[in-house]
């Protein structure tokens, strides 16, 4: 319990601190505060012994909060704790990444239980078993389109014009069936909930799931069978979805395409696109559908925002 005096009439206001979301704040030495410790992104302040100060200057490090200390990071009175792990020099790019992960409470390692669950999974999709309960779309020309440096491919697309005399397209969007491998309340699920998403840095990726899943079973790599969930849609010439259904499927991506290779192919430079296994007919169909969807979006009055990434 902690509190502060409101005024003489109302006395003392008490609050209860149930738990801490972040138990080890990232800190640096702040000489302006008489060799005190200052938290990165919080008002955490503490004093260190002289030996610790000499060892930790110009370093990022964590502080383990004293469990008996019941004040929040925003309290006026300094928290108490001990030095945890040394992250690295404050002028290092790698240290900046590790500091950010620690400051936001994003784990960089998976629990032993999650790693064991991942290792127990098969190295490849057991197609003979999966095809009994999934729609077989392995002959459909689904492709992934991602950035140049992407390593995990979680969605694939394909479309073809309808021959019913009314125009429009059949569009398939397939996403990796993560729930087939990551069951609710399992160790993998618990670790994924801590991360919520994969975190991308300039020199490093912290995946939401172990590599066997993120770059393997749940990545729609070209030429291999993958379990997926599919949205199968009918889109009119006006870009309106007139029918759809969802179902589990077994797919086999035909190509790992990039935004650059696709755009170049649409503008006549097809070399890299073809090397990657792209199909010009399919990509032109997708582009025609895109333009219809874009026009429909404009008719709905959608707003565009320009921002720098």
Where are these regions (language model features)?
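Conserved, carboxylate-rich catalytic/transport cores that coordinate ions
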Residues: 1-309
